Amino acid sequence: QAKVDGIRALGAEVRIVGRSQDDAQVEASRLVREEGFCEIPPFDHPDVIAGQGTIGLELLEARPDIATILIPLSGGGLAAGVALAARTIKPDIRMIGVSMDRGAAMHESLAAGRPVEVEEVESLADSLGGGIGLANAHSFALCRDNLDATVLLTEDEIRLGMQALYFEDRLVTEGAAAVGAAALLAGKV
């Protein structure tokens, strides 16, 4: 709710449509088609994936010795971009997507071998929730081809990751930003 309130405070009109990201996408597509809105896709678009890939390039430029990258995993744009860029430079690098243990759409889709719908749930890592779109055109295949594994975290593990980042490094993060540290602290990587 804090994110929605912040968006409204900036003057935007917020419309909550349906019960899932997939429901909202149907409405967004209608608005583009019927009312001339401009859509900026959150993850499943080549330009978005390419932009996210610059993170992988910067990581390897700064630390060419990195053997493994942990990537927050949601709709797959970030994971696809970082993994593809990093693998282009360093083909043997290990790429691990990290998500919450409930409502992890990309993880469930990878396990099923195709995009699937999942129930969206409240989470400390809520920005990792939401569907990937049943007609996913880019991020699913790139994640399938470039992630070595996915790791799922409980709410307690995410909370402990957030706390560790705050108390040890003085970083205030949302849950999704803490999943890499949380996976390490939980011994899942």
Where are these regions (language model features)?
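PLP-dependent amino-acid enzyme catalytic core
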Residues: 1-189
